[in-house]
Amino acid sequence: MPKYFFHLAGQLPAHDLLGLECANDKEAKDHGSFIAHRIGTEKPGMVREGNYISVTNEHGKEIFQIPLASTTV
């Protein structure tokens, strides 16, 4: 299975060094969305324009940008 990486981009960037094997791009996007919502919910101060999860493939090509989002009310 191909490996994908889920980097935090924006104000406080963090690089995913381990990555995760996913069956395809859709599964990687779904996992990136999960991460974006989890960070947004646990750290609502991070939800702002310019902060997002950058999903890259094993060749380093960015395939998705997923904005951080909070599910808290």
What are these model-derived regions, one by one?
Residues 16, 30, 63-65:
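Short acidic, gly/pro-rich beta-turn/loop elements at beta-sheet edges
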Residues 14-25:
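A short, exposed loop/beta-hairpin motif centered on an aromatic-Gly-Thr core
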